[in-house]
Amino acid sequence: MSGHSKWSQIKHKKALTDKKKGQIFSKLGRLITLAAKKGTDPRSNPSLSQAIDNARAVNMPNENIERAIKKVSDKSQVQLEELSIEALGPGGIALKVRAITDNRNRTMAEIKKILTENNSKLVQPGSLTWMFNQPLTLGDSSIQEQLDKLFEALDDQDEVEDVSSNLAN
């Protein structure tokens, strides 16, 4: 019966759930900090109020919420910025990636690497806007698999907040 302790089983499951919680809390913390730039009072700042409500919905500790708001007033803290990135995905699919980061160059390099590994490429901002008015449908299952892999890789990236495409639902 060696190696079958109950704690070792729980430990592995707990590590996975803690990692997922940490990623969610990080994303929500960045959203709160970004929203708090417009004002640190949730009563007068609806976007901050919404971000706090979202954080509370997933049981984010109040200490983390307060720390995220405090980052805005503390000038020694690193400032966050929002990036809007456009890319051309597999099969000519238009992608918009929204990210919140404290280091623009690092985030752009990481997203560019993910796109390159998944048969996609960055394009100039605004050059694909027209494509979102013309939804595409996929007939090739291999392209759908590539897109699923790309969306999963982008979703695993901590700074990425939202990914949208011109695929018809």
Please annotate each region the language model reported.
Residues 122-169:
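Positively charged, low-complexity, intrinsically disordered RNA-binding extensions
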Residues 1-136, 168:
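N-terminal cationic and glycine-rich segments that engage phosphates or anionic surfaces
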